Design a protein with these regions (language model features):
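PLP-dependent class I/II
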Residues: 1-19, 27-59, 74, 78, ...
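Pre-Walker A segment
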Residues: 66-67
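Conserved AdoMet
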Residues: 62
Length: 392
């Protein structure tokens, strides 16, 4: 006998991974230069030089046993001190090292936080469009996954739509800004309205409704747009952060959970996060990477290449007549599928070796996602294909 839920998760790849694997196969058949693969959000700019320098210096100067040995489960103190110092310098947030739990990227942090906040019969909501893996994360934690219908075409948060689905069994809502897949950044007004609503409903229900703020794209914002730090707007916010995108380290798996003192029962929540991580098999985040973050927590990415790609694609597609949500952050565009059927449009594009992820798994069936963390040359070469598809 096996676990049927686990079997289904393992045997059915996500639409993103399936398209990515197809792209790799097609690249072998027709040449990588002839495949326009916009499927996967894999950073295309190198890690900052400070990161590579830190790795080299650590390998040369640090005793091997110390460098590769176990750390504490919550993470090395120097790493947590560096993260707290960086957050306080930027946001005056009052972060303490003991409020931080170092994780193997954002995904296990999200799962641990969901588990920590789940009570019998609990529901955790996400705003469409949302990252598809939220559903298995929430369900693995033992909660029910609920979706708040998308606010199209702005893709902000519609207060009335959320209020209609807020019930006493809602433990938390997941907020992802800058957003994957839309590239939209939630405005300060949007987040203030959200905080006001959750405060009022929490008082009505007799328990706080937490926000789980998923922030892997926090540093990826353009045109000077503000990315508000949610714990300063809503006290019951838990932050899940990853350095995968900001430092181009997706394969190294390093991030953190921040449980602010302002959150209800913060000490218990922190302990519950630690316990949930333990039950998931967490021992510690990679020791070498923790030491890198201790030196590089304040390093920022060079966004010039992403911004150039963003402008080229957004302006090019909009000029052709595509309806596109203006991308202010991350490295995604979310485009309305001509004809309204994203699956059919993506299949048609696939026949031209243009790989676009339909929005069905993101909770928005009529849209498709473009990841523009690719070469600028590929973008320029693919634009005529987008024009052909629109004309057909």
């Amino acid at each position: 006998m096996i676990n049927e839920t686990a079997y289904l998760l393992g045997s059915n790849r996500s639409c993103i991974r399936e398209l990515f694997e197809y792209g790799r196969q097609r690249a072998q058949e027709v040449g990588a230069q002839n495949v326009y693969d916009y499927s996967l959000g894999n950073p295309s700019i190198p890690a900052p030089p400070e990161v590579n320098a830190a790795i080299r210096q650590l390998l040369e100067d640090t005793d091997s046993l110390q460098l590769h040995g176990y750390t504490t489960a919550v993470g090395d103190l120097p790493a947590r001190e560096a993260i707290a110092q960086d957050l306080n310098a930027r946001f005056s947030a009052g972060v303490r090292p003991e409020d931080l739990f170092i994780t193997c990227g954002a995904a296990p942090g999200l799962t641990a936080v969901c588990k920590a906040l789940t009570f019998p019969g609990a529901k955790i909501l996400a705003f469409a469009p949302y990252f598809p893996e939220y559903k298995p994360f929430v369900e693995a934690a033992g909660a029910q996954f609920g979706v708040v219908e998308a606010d199209v075409p702005a893709f902000q948060i519609c207060r009335s739509t959320l209020e209609a689905v807020l019930t006493p069994d809602v433990a938390a809502v997941i907020v992802n800004s800058p957003n994957n897949p839309s590239g939209v950044v939630y405005s300060r007004q949007t987040l203030t309205d959200l905080a006001d609503l959750l405060t009022r409903k929490g008082e009505e229900f007799g328990h706080p409704i937490y926000i789980i703020s998923d922030e892997p794209y926090r540093e990826l914002a353009y045109d000077g747009v503000e990315v508000p730090f949610l714990p300063l707007i809503y006290p019951h916010t838990l932050v899940c952060y990853s350095y995968s995108k900001s430092l181009s380290l997706p394969g190294e798996r390093i991030g953190y959970v921040y449980v602010p003192q302002s959150a209800a029962d913060s000490a218990k929540v922190y302990a519950a996060v630690a316990g949930a991580a333990r039950a998931m098999g967490h021992v510690c985040a990679p020791s070498l990477l923790q030491k890198v973050i201790a030196r590089c927590a304040s390093v920022r990415p060079d966004l010039e290449a992403y911004d150039r790609n963003r402008r080229t694609l957004y302006e090019g597609l909009a000029a052709m007549g595509y309806e596109v949500a203006k991308p202010e952050g991350a490295f995604y565009l979310f485009v309305k599928a001509p004809g309204g059927d994203a699956m059919a449009f993506s299949e048609k594009a696939k026949k031209k070796d243009l790989l676009l992820v339909p929005g069905n798994d993101f909770g928005c069936p009529g849209y498709f996602r473009i990841c523009y963390c690719v070469s600028h040359a590929m973008i320029q070469k693919s634009l005529p294909v987008f024009r052909q598809l629109l004309a057909e």
